[in-house]
Structures are given as C-alpha cells and as structure tokens.
Amino acid sequence: MAKREKKETFRTSIGGQALIEGILMRGPEKQAIVVRAPEGLVTKVEELKLVRDKYPILGLPIIRGVVTFLDSMVKGIKALMFSADYFPDDEAAQPSKFDLWLEKHVPAEKFQSILVTFSLLLSLALCLGLFMLLPTFVAGLFHAQSALVHNLIEGAIKILIFIGYLFLCSRQKDVHRVFQYHGAEHKTIFCYEAGLPLTVENVRPQPKHHPRCGTSFLFVVIIVSILVSSLVFPYINWQNIWVRIGVKLLLLIPVVGVTYEFNRFVGAHDNAVTRILSAPGMWMQNFTTNEPDDSMIEVAIEAMKLVIPAEKGKDQW
C-alpha cells in the first residue's frame, strides 16, 4: 500500500502587533498600520528597512535575535504613537510641564525620534526592574544555601510576576480592546496560512492563540534565563547580589538570541515535541488575546492584505 503523503503546512513570516484600535502587520518587504479612527479606516504603508540587510553580520544566528527584538520594539512604539494620535485622552487637557519643556527645547523634526528613544528606554527599564531586579532582591530574602535552589526560587518569582502583570493588564478596559485586536491578528494569520480567502467569515472561526506570538517569546525568554542562570551561577560568587545583577545583564544578549532561535525552530515544525514545547507560551496567550468583533477582524484583514508579497512564497517562514 502506498504511503499517504502528508500535506505540508504553509507558515508565513508575516507577523503583527495590536495597537490602539488598530493593527500593525509586518511582511518581508513592507509593514502596514491600519487604524479604525473616528473618521474611518486610516492606513500607513512603509517599505521595511532592516538594519541586518545593511550589515550582514547582524543576520547571524543569536545576533539576529537581539537585533530583531530591538527593531520590533522601536517599530512597535512608533506604531503605537501613530495610533494613539487618533484617540487623544482629553482634547481640553492642559499640556504638562514636561510637554511644555519638550516643545521649548526639542526641535520639531527631532521630537518623535527623541520620544521613541525615551519610550524604548523606559520600556526596557520597566522590564529589567520587574523581571530582573525585583525577583533578585525578593529571592535574596529566602537565604537559599545553594545556587540551584536560589535560581529556582527566583525563577518562580519571575513567572508569578509575569502572570500577575499580564492578568492585571487584561483587566483594564482599554487594554481588553487591544487584546481583542491581538486575537484578530492571530486569526487572520491562521486564515492566510490555511490558504483561505481573507474574509470575516473565514477568519472568525480561526484560533486566537498562535505559536509564534510575542507573548510566547517573552515567556520563553524567562524560562531560558532561568536555565542559563542555573548553569552559570554555581561557578561564580552568586551570593553577591550585585554580581548576580551584573552577570544577568551580560547574559541578556545570549538569552534573547537563543530564545529567538528556539522560536524559529518551533515555528518551523509541527509535531508532538514542538507542540509540547510551545504549550506554556500558548497558555499565556489566554491573558493577551480576546475574541475580536467583526470590525476588528476587518482591520486585521486590511493590514494583512497590504503586506502580502506579490511573489508567492516569499514570506515562507
């Protein structure tokens, strides 16, 4: 009897990010922002310029993960600012002293780049504070007698903080809508990968959890950091808190790089092993994705259509 051929599942490299009442989609050639503003759909399409295309060394394994992560953060912050401009909190509100200082001292043409840099540094500082400094100080209160036990305690604290942070975010009304757009983004990508026409009817029943999601990536970063710390700290002066913090900062680059390569591997294969490996990150998406309404799906479809390459297969994962 002839063996039945297993149909190869298409996986796209197109990915996205939920915005304020909108979605950012990134394809192999360009990125598109689509926002459902009060006056209707607003779109912004840009050619995708990657720094690793200019400097090939930045495309090497491990290094490319760090570069991609930082590039995604910068582009994501810019896209969030773009979408936020259509939904001011209070038009009648007086500008803050900080806003007035910026207007006076910062040239208009440099304003956005400075604001993006400030937002990026603030985001990185928040991540380091919540998921590195806080767990390190709290774990020190347990006075563990071995590096392994200390790392396990610290790792458990990191995971609890991560889950708690996502849970609290998901309870906010405005964030709940952002997470609905996140679900719409995932559903649209699944529909496209299945080879179905991009219609609301086809997108709606698709899963809202996707194995190549940024939530999964961040969770795996935490897990990899725990594993790497368990291998490194038994051989150094791990009881000195400042040594621990310094070493962790140095390990951030390989941790992010290894996580990126892990996600690429898991995203490229669909079998029992990769499904088990991706299961914890998929579960985390219960906090960061919600079922979207049809209007949100329409936004995701429009964003997807704008970045699908003309050359078939160019966006193969």
Indicate residue ranges for each PLM-predicted region.
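Divalent-cation
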Residues: 1-88
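Polar-ligand-bearing catalytic/cofactor-coordination segments
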Residues: 2-19, 23-25, 95, 145, ...
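Cytosolic juxtamembrane amphipathic/interface segments immediately preceding
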Residues: 5-13, 18-19, 52-59, 100-116, ...
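Hydrophobic alpha-helical membrane-embedded segments
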Residues: 60-82, 153-178, 252-268
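Juxtamembrane "helix exit" motif at the C-terminal ends of alpha-helical transmembrane segments
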Residues: 82-83, 123-146, 221-246, 260
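Membrane interface segments of multi-pass transport proteins and intramembrane proteases
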Residues: 99-110, 137-153, 233-246, 265-275, ...
